[in-house]
């Protein structure tokens, strides 16, 4: 069972296992093995203790949701385990509520100099943008999955509770890392904005989050610096097309570019980081 924020994780895991074994064992795997996926939870690794044990912390979740597709045979009853045939919808819900909210907190929080996700969640200028973006994503999800409305409300409440969890001390750097991957058209920010666009619903605040992700420039993140380099030399339109899957003349692309331009112009030095954010210009 694969537990990773990766589209098609079940097929990916299947492929990786088959590539790692001999043809003879591959036949056994195909005959007897089942490949499935589970919803991921937020887990942060810490240091390694002297005895070799890994220290980690995570959200206080007690349920495990598993995709019924790909499982072979009947699983025994397991407490707090839910096996569902609506796994794709549940993944989308999680991505556009939990992960979207964390991304908004990380990228916009970074522009205000926040170091931790809970700081961004409590920041007077950042928190309203997070909540508005979540509301946009919620509306889009309810339009897409009307029979999931009550569950989507619970997802949204959980998302806000998670980012405010001081005990986890989750860092902006961890959540924001590799912004390029998270700007994909199927990912937490652009995907949510596209879903809202498809249902002709507002997505202005999601666009602010996307603009902040495009501007993320943590010097410790080589992916972020690579993104900034490409924007500097090739322009933001290239990134919107190749990474976000948007054509320059798409209304959504124009909206994102407008927010990004406001963010960049608000800094006299044209640095994209903390000094660049001015909420009044959004």
Q: Model regions: which residues?
A:
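Substrate/ligand-engaging "lid" and interaction regions
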Residues: 1-282
């Amino acid at each position: 069972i694969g537990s990773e924020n990766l589209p098609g994780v079940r097929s990916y895991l299947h492929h990786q296992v088959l590539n790692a074994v001999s043809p003879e064992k591959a036949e056994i795997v195909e005959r007897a093995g089942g490949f499935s996926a589970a919803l991921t939870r937020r887990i942060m690794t810490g240091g390694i203790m002297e005895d070799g044990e890994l220290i980690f912390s995570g959200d206080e979740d007690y349920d495990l949701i598993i995709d019924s597709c790909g499982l072979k045979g009947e699983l025994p009853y397991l407490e707090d385990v839910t096996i569902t045939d609506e796994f794709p919808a549940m993944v989308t819900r999680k991505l556009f509520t939990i992960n979207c909210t964390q991304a908004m907190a990380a990228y916009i929080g970074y522009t205000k100099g926040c170091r931790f996700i809970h700081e961004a969640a409590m920041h007077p200028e950042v928190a309203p943008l997070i909540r508005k973006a979540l509301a946009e994503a919620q509306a889009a999800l309810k339009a897409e999955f009307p029979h999931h409305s009550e569950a989507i409300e619970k997802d949204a409440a959980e998302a806000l509770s998670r980012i405010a969890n001081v005990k986890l001390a989750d860092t902006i750097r961890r959540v924001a890392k590799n912004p390029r991957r998270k700007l994909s058209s199927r990912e937490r920010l652009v995907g949510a904005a596209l879903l809202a666009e498809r249902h002709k619903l507002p997505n202005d605040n999601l666009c602010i989050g996307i603009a902040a992700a495009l501007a993320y420039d943590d010097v410790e993140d080589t992916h972020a610096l690579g993104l900034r380099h490409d924007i500097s030399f090739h322009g933001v339109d290239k990134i919107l097309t190749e990474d976000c899957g948007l054509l320059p003349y798409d209304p959504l692309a124009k909206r994102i570019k407008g927010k990004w331009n406001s963010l960049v112009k608000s800094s006299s030095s044209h640095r994209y980081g903390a000094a660049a954010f001015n909420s009044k210009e959004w």
